[in-house]
């Protein structure tokens, strides 16, 4: 237990202890995608309780990138101020912060929108899921820009680090998986191509945002012919080459 309470580091961040609060969606916002009183109470309570590093829940890079209408967003400059205020409160109690920037892809259930994905393969044929459109090369360029701009906003909001969400079957994870990505261009097919989008986003964020970068990935889909542990090892090595400061790995994806 003594090691748990010793100082730790992630990139240039010094943590007062090694207790980390991972990102967990609370679904307590609304169509505004703003932080509510609930969020401020929720995160501040962890900081007061002594958590050393708090990663704020999945925060969308565009409106249709939310998992639901109750998710957070950071796709506009007007959304920065609330996050800045949250960080000020958390930092007062000595905790460091990161924000998980994300796009739900085909798992988005936002009303009156059509989800986007690497291929026209629905997550489920049941409500509330919809059949996605296939991302064009222009769409992919736009997706990269959305992630980079959101990372820039995160820095302006005084987050100490950024976590890129490439797990749990959401958009970036969908590009990684051969079960959800059946493209025949440079973003599909072999492992190198399927990892391309994640690596391109990481490269641009590292170039434009001077903050430690964490990438969350799924270790294994546990499905025949799906993403597996060897794929994760390959991706992790490529991420390390690009200067990623930490890899946050979870057991499986949900595709």
Language-model features, listed with the residues they occupy:
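Flavin-dependent oxidoreductase catalytic cores
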Residues: 1-254
């Amino acid at each position: 237990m003594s090691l748990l309470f010793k100082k730790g580091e992630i990139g240039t961040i010094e943590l007062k202890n090694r207790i980390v609060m991972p990102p967990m969606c609370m679904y307590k916002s609304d169509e505004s995608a703003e932080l509510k009183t609930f969020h401020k109470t929720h995160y501040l309570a962890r900081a007061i309780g002594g958590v050393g590093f708090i990663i704020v829940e999945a925060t969308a890079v565009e409106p249709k990138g939310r998992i639901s209408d109750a998710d957070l967003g950071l796709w506009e400059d007007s959304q920065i101020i609330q996050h800045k205020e949250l960080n000020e409160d958390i930092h007062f109690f000595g905790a460091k912060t990161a924000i998980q920037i994300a796009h739900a892809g085909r798992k988005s259930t936002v009303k009156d929108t059509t989800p986007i994905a690497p291929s026209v393969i629905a997550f489920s044929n049941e409500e509330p899921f919809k059949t996605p459109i296939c991302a064009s090369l222009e769409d992919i360029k736009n997706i990269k820009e959305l992630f980079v701009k959101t990372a820039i906003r995160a820095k302006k909001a005084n987050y100490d680090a950024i976590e890129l969400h490439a797990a749990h079957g959401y958009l970036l994870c969908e590009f990684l998986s051969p079960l959800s990505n059946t493209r025949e261009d440079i973003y599909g097919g072999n492992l190198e191509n399927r990892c391309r989008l994640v690596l391109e986003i990481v490269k641009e964020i590292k170039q434009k945002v001077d903050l430690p970068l964490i990438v969350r990935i799924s270790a294994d889909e546990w499905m025949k012919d799906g993403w597996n542990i060897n794929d994760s090892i390959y991706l992790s090595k490529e991420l390390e080459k690009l200067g990623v400061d930490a890899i946050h790995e979870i057991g499986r994806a949900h595709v």
